[in-house]
Amino acid sequence: MNNIRHIIFFLLSFIGLSAKAQKTDAMMQLPPIQRAALIIKHFEGWHSGKGPYIGWGHRIQPGEHLSHNITRQQGDSLLYEDLRKLFNQFKGYGDYALLLTVLSYNVGPAKILGNGKYKPSRLIQKIRQGRKDIEQDYLDFCRWKGRVIPSIKKRRWAEFQYLYPIQ
């Protein structure tokens, strides 16, 4: 009886791994911008309550007259427009532009590129130097108030796995 149970558990775990591999393959078949949008949608979630964010994490800017009861289609449009604007800031980084765009959607471009308040991140410094060993520096963007947040680390890992340019 125990042997049968072990065999069933083994087969079920194998089926689960196969389904996960198929899902990963399907995700990689999508265009990179759609992969980026799906990752953001998954981890950001839908913002419909109070606060400065609406849709899939769009921050309402001064002068924008948007309400919190927008449709999912409007939320998608805002997401793609935000990604386009951020991508324009990073397009000089070649293959890394989309990865940096998705990161900046969550942390803001100033924390990556630097400005008067922040110095350029180690991640952007390595990319500018042409170094490829950026995984740990990318995953280090998982802190909030100095603490590592597991859900953010999981998000960074997913972003890196699906958007890091394979060379």
Predicted regions and their residues:
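Sec-dependent N-terminal signal peptides
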Residues: H6-I15
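Short N-proximal segments of mature Sec-exported proteins
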Residues: A97-K111
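N-terminal secretory signal peptides that target proteins for export/translocation
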Residues: M1-N3
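Sec/Tat signal peptide C-region and signal peptidase I cleavage site
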Residues: L17-A21
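Long, amphipathic alpha-helical surface segments
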Residues: L11, Q22-K50, H58-E64, I70-Q89, ...
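Short, solvent-exposed, charged loop/turn and helix-capping segments
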Residues: F87, K91-A97
